[in-house]
């Protein structure tokens, strides 16, 4: 969000010298002891607390070797190696939430719990986050996404605890299938199945407004209307463009990068699927797919940034 000019305040769990360049955008600040500090100042004033995740990206047909065994990747995907204690414990600064309330934040994104790998840690942390979400005014949109994928039923626990305290809950289409116990291979592009899963997701976890789903060909919103002045269709379109910019340039995306995507053709699959989805009350926008992407990591995060910048 900082890279394309949206003023944002972040809560950092892990940080070190590597963050100085990655997050050094004027609109972006870091919360520290009741203040919003520029990233470099925050890093100067706080001792390093660095705990990286390693993400290995590979293409369809790639040979993957683990010790004496070899596999051929059937699809492009990635392997996430997370070994640190810090992100699994996820220490939270409660002052960040109070600062957001006091300053009437337009939106509050709840994410980053995906590093939690112990069930007892997850249960305690979700209860803590739920308490911290109490007392926000209606002008702050609480957006909850990216569940704890290392744990069995992690997504279910996550949305069960936080769904009712959120305006919007969000995930990818693959996560939607997993949450509902449905095999992605059984989907076959069936928009009616997609509508059933959206409806089940919405009515199981009871967000105050609705659910957002992003996928390769179409992004979707299903639920109650958003407050006046919040245009969900524009937000979905912006999310799609920011994700495509990340795929094309392997970068967070300046305004110029993002808007260079605007003239790209819409997904033909998405255009076909939308006709049926809209009849079922789903607001849907086709994506702008990038052939031969330079990067496939963090596209969901980029979509979220684009969506929140407009809504």
Predicted regions and their residues:
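Active-site-proximal C-terminal subdomain of hydrolase catalytic domains
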Residues: 307
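Catalytic tyrosine of NAD(P)H-dependent dehydrogenase/reductases that use a Tyr as the general acid/base
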Residues: 297
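Conserved single-residue anchors adjacent to enzymatic active/cofactor-binding motifs
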Residues: 300
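Ribokinase/PfkB-type carbohydrate-kinase core domain
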Residues: 2-294, 311
